From Swiss-Prot:
The modification Phosphothreonine is found at T180. GO terms for biological process: epithelial cell differentiation. Gene3D superfamilies: Calponin-like domain. It comes from Mus musculus (Mouse). This is Transgelin-2. The modification Omega-N-methylarginine is found at R182, R196. The gene is Tagln2. Pfam families: Calponin, CH.
Length: 199
């Protein structure tokens, strides 16, 4: 966790909430997908959040992952270099994030560099990788490797085309929100404040 000291009070509660969101089962799925997708020796970390963070921390695995989702010769990250220097590692992580955004991931679904590098929010890192995998499956361009069932299926556009006659008929239908004109009614009820007539 880099050079930060322990957090106390509200900061500690917030950090504990973030740490509870981390999914160990999802970690194993992501590791399996990354090693299958990269098709080269990227290693495999021991189970656990800290080991997962150390595996991805220098950005080389992430850059190899995003490059594997593009056709040969169109890789977005040109130079991937393992380095022990902090700013080089953070630069590679940010290159991955920029490439992921160009690939189609929403800006709101992308983690920040410090979330991974300092290990502050590994659940957010998992969400970004899940979205990337789901988007790769949805593209169906033949570059995805692995089991498509590992990721949630993205919805596809399914437009409905109605004729003018169908649209006109729809205007005549009484919607269920309006109630019904059949069944029980208030017919025969006395007005408000009148005594009940029991015979």
């Amino acid at each position: 966790m880099a050079n930060r000291g322990p957090s106390y009070g509200l900061s500690r509660e917030v950090q504990q909430k973030i740490e509870k969101q981390y999914d160990a089962d999802l970690e194993q799925i992501l590791i399996q997908w990354i090693t299958t997708q990269c098709r080269e020796d990227v290693g495999q970390p021991q189970p656990g959040r800290e080991n997962f963070q150390k595996w991805l921390k220098d950005g080389t695995v992430l850059c190899k992952l995003i490059n594997s989702l593009y056709p040969e010769g169109q890789a977005p990250v040109k130079k991937i270099q393992a380095s022990s220097m902090a700013f080089k590692q953070m630069e590679q992580i940010s290159q991955f994030l920029q490439a992921a955004e160009r690939y189609g991931i929403n800006t709101t679904d992308i983690f920040q560099t410090v979330d991974l590098w300092e290990g502050k929010n590994m659940a957010c890192v998992q969400r970004t990788l899940m979205n990337l995998g789901g988007l790769a499956v949805a593209r169906d361009d033949g570059l995805f490797s692995g089991d498509p069932n590992w990721f949630p299926k993205k919805s596809k556009e399914n437009p409905r085309n109605f004729s003018d006659n169908q649209l006109q008929e729809g205007k005549n239908v009484i919607g269920l929100q309006m109630g019904t004109n059949r069944g029980a009614s208030q017919a025969g009820m006395t007005g408000y404040g009148m005594p009940r007539q029991i015979l």
